[in-house]
Regions:
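A short Gly-Trp-Pro
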Residues: 1-7, 12-159
Length: 159
């Protein structure tokens, strides 16, 4: 059963997800700012096996600040960004939340890379923030409970 669906602006690329997201984040890293053209990007992470994409996407890869590969996928027709994957977050794909048919169906719980916050961009003050990535690998972080990751907002640097 499909729980979430979305598509790019022109409709050439779409997806369906058959599970709840593992986590939903706002990211204020420089890569997300550059690729979104905004102060942050919002991502819903799903297990790769739960998401089915349709249409052909173009890809652009960069090296992340921890040395892994970040691959962004987008529609070659309208340029709409669709998905993001990290080499160190195997088994997950992050879907651009703005592409969801019902973007209000998800709620971000955490802001990453808050040390790079842009003063004119506003996210809910109630969200937990972390200055960069938690000091675990992406894979370990994704497997941990999100509320454990939120302890970083209180200044505790260990999980």
């Amino acid at each position: 059963m499909v729980k979430y669906a979305g598509k790019c602006q022109c409709g050439a690329v779409g997806y369906e997800a058959k599970s709840e997201p593992s986590f939903v984040i706002h990211c204020e890293c420089l890569d997300c700012k550059k690729s979104s053209g905004a102060g942050h990007a919002t991502w819903a992470a799903f297990e790769t096996a739960a998401v089915q994409f349709s249409g052909v996407m173009s890809r652009h890869s960069t090296i992340a600040d921890r040395g892994g590969t970040t691959t962004r996928e987008f529609c070659p027709t309208c340029g709409g960004r669709m998905a993001l994957s990290y080499s160190s977050l195997s088994g997950h794909v992050l879907v651009a939340a703005g592409t969801l048919d019902d973007p209000d169906s998800i709620i971000p719980s955490l802001v990453l890379y808050n040390k790079r916050h842009t003063v004119w961009d506003h996210v809910a003050a109630s969200l937990a923030t972390y200055p960069a990535m938690p000091p675990r690998t992406y894979s370990e972080w994704a497997k941990s409970r999100l509320d454990e990751a939120c302890v970083f907002a209180s200044g505790n640097d260990t999980l």
